Structures are given as structure tokens and as C-alpha cells.
């Protein structure tokens, strides 16, 4: 169950849409978003964690994200997700299974943090950012509260390094007691990825079971 919880987290970073926003917060998010809008390609090292308050269980896994325009490859020890601009491939090595789908644009925005951090026009309320110092770094914490009561989370927060406006952490606080955290450990922008790096090669997995739901 733990691995499926993390897969759900990978697939549901949650679209950042909020209204009646604080101008100071918008200015911070603009600067963070521009890092990726202006980049030829971005690579991130991530730590993905789930904390279940009801059971006390904690699960985490490290991952690597490569993204350019609308394409991305998100790799962890238990699954690889690859979106080539049209199709999404999810490979799970423990069961040797590949799932192929053609998700809507809004669904893809939920999976790639660089897309998420640029979508902040409506749908959320956001107060003035909080400021603090962590490990010698001055940071801002921007919190978002969904206006739609049907959302399965009640708060989302983004930590931003004020020295370079890079995101440090994205945390989603679920109504079910689940706290999902993405720690961004390292960011490299203006990467020049080859086409081969961003396209899923089915030939590499000749014995994998393929589930095509396109």
C-alpha cells in the first residue's frame, strides 16, 4: 500500500490555482515560476514523503525529475513516469508492468512541479507569506487554501529560498490526515536534454506487461 500511496502523490502534486492572492506572495511566485519558464530544460533531485497521521506510518523515496516544455521523466526506485507531450508511460519494475495513457493537460500539470508552480491565477486564497531562517537560509513560506471545498486537501505550502527564488519544498496537507511532502534537494536549469532522454523506449522492456488505456 505504501508504494501506491507514493504513486498517488507523484500523480497528484495538486494544481496551484488560487484567487484573492496577496501581491507580495504573487511576486515571489512569479520569480520562482520564471526560473522554469526561461529554462531550456530543468533537472531536479527530489525526496518524496508521505506521513499518515492516523496510522503514524511514514514513507519516503528519492527521485529524479527531468523536464522540458511539456515533457518530463520522473524516476524513483519503484516507478518511472514519462510524458512525451502526448502519452504518459508508467513503468513499475517490481511487477514488470507498463501503463500507457493519454491524460488531459490539467492532469499533466498535476504531475510536473515546474508546471504546477506557474499556475496561480484563481481558485485559492493565500495570505501574506511567512518568513524565517533555516540552516542559514532566509526563506519564504507561501500557503494556499482551496476555495473549492471538494478538494481533498485543506492547505498547500511552498518554501522558497530567498537568495535565488528556487523552491525548497512543496507540502500538501490532506483532509484525511495524510501529509505529502516534496523536498527539492537540487535544481539544475538550462539543461540540454537529448530527445532520447525524454522519450520512453518500449524496446527496453520486451517482457513487460503493457496496459494501454489510451
At which residue positions do the language-model features occur?
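Sec-dependent N-terminal signal peptides
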Residues: 4-13
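N-terminal leader/targeting segments and the immediate start of mature chains
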Residues: 16-57, 68-71, 204-214
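Beta-turn initiation residues at beta-strand->coil junctions
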Residues: 48, 76, 92-93, 171-174
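Solvent-exposed strand-loop boundary residues in beta-sheet-rich modules
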Residues: 54, 94-96, 176
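An acidic-aromatic
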Residues: 62-111, 180-181
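Surface-exposed, polar helix/loop patches in the mature regions of secreted/periplasmic/lumenal proteins
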Residues: 87-145
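Gly/Pro-enriched, hydrophobic low-complexity segments
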Residues: 127-206, 211-213
Amino acid at each position: 500500500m505504501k508504494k501506491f500511496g507514493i504513486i498517488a502523490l507523484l500523480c497528484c502534486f495538486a494544481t496551484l490555482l488560487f484567487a484573492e492572492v496577496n501581491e507580495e506572495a504573487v511576486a515571489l511566485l512569479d520569480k520562482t515560476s520564471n526560473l522554469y519558464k526561461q529554462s531550456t530544460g530543468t533537472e531536479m533531485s527530489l525526496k518524496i514523503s508521505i506521513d499518515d497521521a492516523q496510522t503514524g506510518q511514514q514513507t519516503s523515496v528519492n527521485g529524479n525529475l527531468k523536464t522540458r516544455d511539456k515533457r518530463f521523466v520522473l524516476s524513483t526506485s519503484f516507478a518511472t513516469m514519462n510524458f512525451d507531450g502526448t502519452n504518459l508511460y508508467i513503468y513499475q519494475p517490481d511487477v514488470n508492468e507498463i501503463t500507457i495513457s493519454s491524460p488531459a493537460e490539467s492532469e499533466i500539470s498535476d504531475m510536473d512541479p515546474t508546471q504546477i508552480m506557474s499556475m496561480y491565477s484563481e481558485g485559492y486564497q493565500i495570505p501574506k507569506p511567512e518568513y524565517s531562517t533555516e540552516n542559514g537560509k532566509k526563506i519564504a513560506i507561501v500557503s494556499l487554501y482551496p476555495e473549492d471545498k471538494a478538494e481533498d486537501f485543506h492547505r498547500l505550502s511552498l518554501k522558497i529560498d530567498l537568495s535565488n527564488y528556487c523552491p525548497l519544498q512543496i507540502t500538501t496537507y490532506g483532509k484525511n490526515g495524510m501529509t505529502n511532502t516534496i523536498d527539492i534537494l537540487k535544481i539544475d536549469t538550462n539543461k540540454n536534454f537529448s530527445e532520447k532522454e525524454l522519450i520512453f523506449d518500449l524496446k527496453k522492456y520486451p517482457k513487460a506487461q503493457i496496459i494501454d488505456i489510451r
